[in-house]
Amino acid sequence: MLSVVIPVYNEGAVLEKTASVIRGVLSDAAIGCELIFVDDGSKDTTWEKITALSASGGIRGLHFSRNFGKEAAILAGLAAAKGDCCFVIDGDLQHPPEKIVEMYRLWRGGYQVGGGGKASRGKEKPLHTFAAQ
C-alpha cells in the first residue's frame, strides 16, 4: 500500500478536489493507497473538511493545535503512515499527482528514495526565484 502525506494550511476550499484527483489517479493505476492530510494549525475550515473526508475511508487526518510549519507536518504524516511506500505532495495540487504513479513504479522497480522539483520556475516574481535558489 502507498501512503500519500499531504501537509495543508488553510486549504479547506480545495481539499475535496485534492482528495478526488489523487484518489482518481491512483485508482486508475490500480495502486492501493491511504491519504493522510496533516492540518498545520489552519484557521479556516480545513480540519472540518478533513474530518468529513475521513468518513469515506482511506483518508486519515492529523491536526496540529497551532502552525508548526510544513516540515513538522510532513514528519508527523510520515510517522503516521501505514504504507510500505510514502509520497509527500502539496495540498493545492501545484505538482501533478500523476508523478506519484511514476515514482511509485520506480520504487516497485527497486529504487528506495526519490524526489522531484520544478523543471522550470516559470513566471515567478524575481524575489521568490532568488529565495528558492
List PLM regions with ranges.
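Short helix-capping segments at alpha-helix termini
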Residues: 26-31, 54-59
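A conserved acidic beta->alpha catalytic loop
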Residues: 39-47, 93-94
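Cell-envelope/extracellular polymer assembly enzymes that use nucleotide-activated donors
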Residues: 1-3, 34
